[in-house]
Amino acid sequence: MEVRVESLRKEFGRFPALVDVTLDILSGELIALLGPSGSGKTTLLRLIAGLESPTEGMIFFGDEDASKRTVQERNIGFVFQHYALFRHMTVLDNVTFGLKVRPANRRPPAAEIRRRALDLIDLVQLSGLEKRYPAQLSGGQRQRVALARAMAVEPSVLLLDEPFGALDAQVRKELRRWLREIHDRTGYTTLFVTHDQEEALELADRVVVMSKGAIEQVGTPDEIYDHPVSPFVYGFIGQSNCLNVTLANGEIWFEGRPIGLRAANEPDGQATLFFRPHDVELIEGGSGCLAGRVTASRRVAGTRHLELDLGKTQSSIEVELPPELASSADRTRIALRPTKWKLFCGE
C-alpha cells in the first residue's frame, strides 16, 4: 500500500508540532522516521494511524483520501514501545484479539483465525509459547507478540513507535536484524519511529530525518550519511566535527591560516566546515593543515580516539585513528587535514 502525506500541519494549541510535511512512501518500503525529541516524528506517525487529526493537509492510502477515516477504517497495524499486551490473555489470545473483535461480516471463521495466529507465532519464532502470559515472557518476546498481533489483521500499513526503546542494547541489535527479515518476508509497507540513528541506518530502505516539525532530508542510509544536505543532518547523523571557517579566493582558512582545502566555486565569506573523525590524514609539518594539542586519548574497540584543542577560539575536534597510527602520533601536538568534508556557506 502506497502512503502519501501532503502539506501536513498539526498544531497543539498554538504550538506547531508539524509544519508543511510532504512525504511519499512506496508500497512495501521500510521507512525510518528519525529525529531528536520534539522533532515531530511520533506526531506524524499518529496522524498516519488516525490517532490524531491534521490541522491542515491530506493523507492518502493508495489513491484514496484517508484523512477523515477512523483508525479501524484505515486498517493499521500499530506496535507501541511498551508492547500494550493484554496481561490476562495468553500469547495466542493476544495475537487473535484484533480478528475476534471485528464485526461479524468481516470476521474470519474461528479455525482461520487460529491458523493465521499460529502461523504468525511461528513466524516471530515463539512456537511453543502460545499458552504463556505476557508476565512469563522476556521483553524481546513480548515485542514479538506485539508485532504478531499487529500483523494478524493483515494491515494496509504497519506502524511502529520506537519498538525497541524499552529493551537492552544486545536485544535491540538482535531484534533489528529479525525485524528486517520479517519485513522482507511479509512485504508490509512499514514506518517506524526512532531516535537511534544506528537503528535507522541499519534497518530502513529510506530514512526521513526530522527537526522542529519539518523534514530535513529523505534518502537511503548511504545518502543520509555520506551526503547530508544541511548542518543539522551532518551534525545529527554519526559523529562529526564542526569548525567556523572563512573562505577567501576559493581557499578555506581557520584562525587566520589556510588549512590546505579549496572550495573554488563558493563565495568569499563565513562558512561552517564539517568532517567525520575518521575522515582525516596526518600531515608532517605545520603549514596547510589543522594543528592541535592532544588533550585526551582513549581506546574505543579497534580505533583510538584523540581529542585536539585547536587553539585561540577554544575549538576542539575529535579524530579516530588506527591504534598503530595513533601510537606514532602520541605526542603533544599533531597536524592533520580532512580527506572528506562538506562546507555550508553563510551558516
From Swiss-Prot:
Keywords: ATP-binding, Cell inner membrane, Cell membrane, Membrane, Nucleotide-binding, Plasmid, Sulfate transport, Translocase, Transport. It catalyses: sulfate(out) + ATP + H2O = sulfate(in) + ADP + phosphate + H(+); thiosulfate(out) + ATP + H2O = thiosulfate(in) + ADP + phosphate + H(+). This is Sulfate/thiosulfate import ATP-binding protein CysA 1. ATP binds at G35, P36, S37, G38, S39, G40, K41, T42. Belongs to the ABC transporter superfamily. Sulfate/tungstate importer (TC 3.A.1.6) family. Residues 3-237 form the ABC transporter domain. SUPFAM superfamilies: MOP-like, P-loop containing nucleoside triphosphate hydrolases. Part of the ABC transporter complex CysAWTP involved in sulfate/thiosulfate import. Responsible for energy coupling to the transport system. It is a peripheral membrane protein. It is found in: Cell inner membrane. The keyword ATP-binding applies. The complex is composed of two ATP-binding proteins (CysA), two transmembrane proteins (CysT and CysW) and a solute-binding protein (CysP). SMART domains: AAA. NCBIfam families: 3a0106s01 (TIGR00968). It comes from the Bacteria.
